Regions:
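Alpha-helical cap/lid subdomain in secreted, periplasmic
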Residues: 53-64, 80-178
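Short alpha-helical
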Residues: 49, 76, 159
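Sec-dependent N-terminal signal peptides
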Residues: 2-12
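Short histidine/acidic/glycine/proline-rich micro-motifs that form metal-
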Residues: 39-44, 72-76, 104-106, 144-147
Length: 178
């Protein structure tokens, strides 16, 4: 389901002119770089089905015009993501960034405040836009109703996701609210 939401967002959302640049350039035959940057939902084999499906669908339609990088890392949150943003993301010069860390920021052992996810997302958006003002940026957040141990370790997930919603609105980027 997250795969379909992202795919639909990339092809139909026109929040700002920059949000359509990725697709316009692909249609013109220009090469584009896609970077996935998240936690377990984007990297673990059992969770990243949506990443693989999106990649397959884009490759099928645009064949050799796209380079993909999955720079995600399991068990990390926005602190690691911001500290490693230059090496993990900016070094690859993405035209499309799909990222999200609120599900791990909300884990109680990390001792983060809910506003933290949104502020870190803003930092990453600002840094990518400084490098590539035309980059298409997609921020994803996961279900506010996690099950089992995930629910126990993330009692304030809704507040963390809310800070990401605010950041996406403030920065004019695509939000996939799964």
């Amino acid at each position: 389901r997250i795969f379909l939401l992202i795919l639909i967002s990339i092809f139909t959302v026109s929040i700002a002119s920059a949000q359509t640049t990725f697709l316009k350039k692909l249609k013109k035959g220009e090469k584009q770089t896609v970077v996935f940057y998240g936690a377990s939902a984007a990297i673990n084999t059992s969770n990243r089905v949506w990443v693989d499906q999106l990649r397959t669908r884009l490759e099928r339609r645009f064949s050799e015009k796209i380079t993909f990088y999955n720079c995600s890392k399991s068990g990390i949150g926005s602190f690691w993501a911001t500290e490693n943003f230059k090496d993990s993301v900016l070094s690859r010069k993405p035209d499309l960034l799909i990222f999200g860390f609120s599900e791990n920021d909300a884990v109680t052992r990390f001792n983060n405040a809910p506003w933290y996810s949104g502020k870190c997302a803003e930092y990453m958006v600002d840094n990518l836009r400084a490098q590539n003002p035309d980059a298409t940026i997609v921020l994803y957040i996961l279900s506010e109703r996690p099950l089992g141990q995930s629910a126990e370790t993330r009692p304030e997930l809704a507040a963390f996701n809310a800070s990401c919603r605010e950041a996406a609105k403030k920065k004019g980027i695509i939000l996939v609210d799964y």
